[in-house]
């Protein structure tokens, strides 16, 4: 592995992201595509940039990311979690600031399973009194 390269794994819903950061000019590559090409929605791009903006390191690192599984929102959250972990590996003193913003904690919420006899996880069939 290259010198001064830092790694973080992020997960959210059913997505998993592997994030490699190394000093550079602020290039973000996700699955061999740029951030703008990969995420069409501006909100997803903002979520990915959040940890870097919080610690003022937007133009200081090049990010190489591979992400699998889930949808746009889950992948963006997984990438954010991975970037946060990689930044903490780079500099442990950033942990407090990142934790205060809520980026360190893995969001454990998962999709609730559909139950037998119900239409969805909790939605019951319509009740008819007569």
Curated annotation (Swiss-Prot):
Cellular component terms per the entry's GO annotation: cytosolic small ribosomal subunit
GO molecular function: RNA binding; structural constituent of ribosome
UniProt similarity note: Belongs to the universal ribosomal protein uS9 family.
Species this chain originates from: Pectobacterium atrosepticum (strain SCRI 1043 / ATCC BAA-672) (Erwinia carotovora subsp. atroseptica)
Keyword flag Ribonucleoprotein: yes
Coiled-coil region(s): none
Entry-linked NCBIfam families: PRK00132.1
Protein name per Swiss-Prot or TrEMBL: Small ribosomal subunit protein uS9
HAMAP family: Ribosomal_uS9_B
Record GO biological process: translation
Annotated PROSITE patterns: RIBOSOMAL_S9
Keywords of this entry: Ribonucleoprotein, Ribosomal protein
């Amino acid at each position: 592995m290259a010198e001064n390269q830092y790694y973080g794994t992020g997960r959210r819903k059913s997505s998993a992201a592997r994030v490699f950061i190394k000093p550079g000019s602020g290039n973000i590559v996700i699955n061999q595509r740029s951030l703008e090409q990969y995420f069409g929605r501006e909100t997803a791009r903002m979520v990915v940039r959040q940890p870097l903006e919080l610690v003022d390191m937007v133009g200081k690192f090049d990010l190489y990311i591979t992400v699998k599984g889930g949808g746009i929102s889950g992948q963006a959250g997984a990438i954010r979690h991975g970037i946060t972990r990689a930044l903490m590996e780079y500099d442990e003193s950033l942990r407090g600031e990142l934790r205060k913003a809520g980026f360190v904690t893995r969001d454990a919420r998962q999709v609730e399973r559909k139950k037998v006899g119900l239409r969805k996880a909790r939605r019951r069939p319509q009740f008819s009194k007569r």
